[in-house]
Curated annotation (Swiss-Prot):
Gene3D superfamilies: Ribosomal protein S10 domain. The gene is rpsJ. The lineage of its organism: Bacteria, Bacillati, Bacillota, Bacilli, Lactobacillales. GO terms for molecular function: structural constituent of ribosome; tRNA binding. Belongs to the universal ribosomal protein uS10 family. This is Small ribosomal subunit protein uS10. One of its GO terms (biological process) is translation. InterPro entries: Ribosomal_uS10, Ribosomal_uS10_CS, Ribosomal_uS10_dom, Ribosomal_uS10_dom_sf. HAMAP family: Ribosomal_uS10 (MF_00508). Keywords: Ribonucleoprotein, Ribosomal protein. The keyword Transcription does not apply.
Amino acid sequence: MASQQIRIRLKSYEHGILDESAAKIVATAERTGAQISGPVPLPTERTLFTVLRSPHKNKDSREQFEIRTHKRLIDILNPTPKTVDSLMKLDLPSGVDIEIKL
């Protein structure tokens, strides 16, 4: 019989709330008796934007902005129905994007 697995991928611009959310998910899953693999830090995605400082001239004067997207991966092996229920009821911060695959 094949074992079931839940893969949770977390994304956020702030690594602090991302690690806090990952810790909550791991604690909830361990409390309900599931096996955990992770959180695994995935590579940080860096997006760079370059804009002109002046609206009309001075092409040499530019400003750069960046957005860093931090990612974590958590695998829950052999989840129980109690694990799934407690993960659905879990309250996480609003700055974290959660992607769940069964």
